[in-house]
Amino acid sequence: ISQDSVANHCKITNSVILDFNKSQRNETDLWVLFKGRHNELDHCYIAGKSNRGPTVRIDLAGNNSIKNYHKITNNYFGPRPPKGGPSAETIQLGNSFTSMAPSYTLVANNFFDHCNGEVEIISSKTNFNEFRNNVFYKSEGSLVTRHGNYCIIDGNVFIGDENSEQIGGIRLIGTGHWVTNNYF
């Protein structure tokens, strides 16, 4: 298996990834990395990541990974302790170098429970993504359109905690986003 390989039309479903950390907290690791097109992560239980690096990352390097139409749906993302600083998102879509690339990734019907890795629970750095009907429960951070444009953020629920001042919501950067029917 090469780091340059891509996967198309693959699915990770009904799986558990729990406390699968490297021994050194500052070593970067990724629990789920998407490259290619039309891949899915659904009905999984993912919790306990404490290392540097996003839990799930969508990689758009190369023409074979843009317009990817990936789906991240119906998952439980469990507690992630604060890392301190960046590079601890629960979900990262793209990066600064691919911020103008179209992704068309759907993130829907997920439960984010105490996802406190950093200030961005979801970091969207690509175009044309949809975030629908997710629940963010006592998670210290926000859904952020960090780079990129034309995202739909609809029907999400953000449940805070009066004991934390770090609870976020939605932070918009870019053009053409539609934000509708969200509850805070």
For the regions a protein language model found, what residue spans apply to each?
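Structural detector of coil-to-beta-strand junctions
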Residues: S23-Q24, D29-W31, R52-T55, T90, ...
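Blade-loop segments of beta-propeller domains
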Residues: I1-Q3
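Glycine-rich phosphate-binding "P-loop"
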Residues: E89-M100, N116-E120
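Long, acidic/serine-threonine-rich intrinsically disordered regions with weak helical/coil propensity
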Residues: D29, D42-Y45, K49, G53-D59
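Active-site beta-loop-alpha junctions enriched in small/polar residues
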Residues: A61, G94-S96, N127, G148
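Right-handed parallel beta-helix
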Residues: V6-N21, R37-S50, I66-P82, A101-E118, ...
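Active-site cleft segment of glycoside hydrolase catalytic domains centered on the general acid/base Glu
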Residues: V32, I58-N64, G94
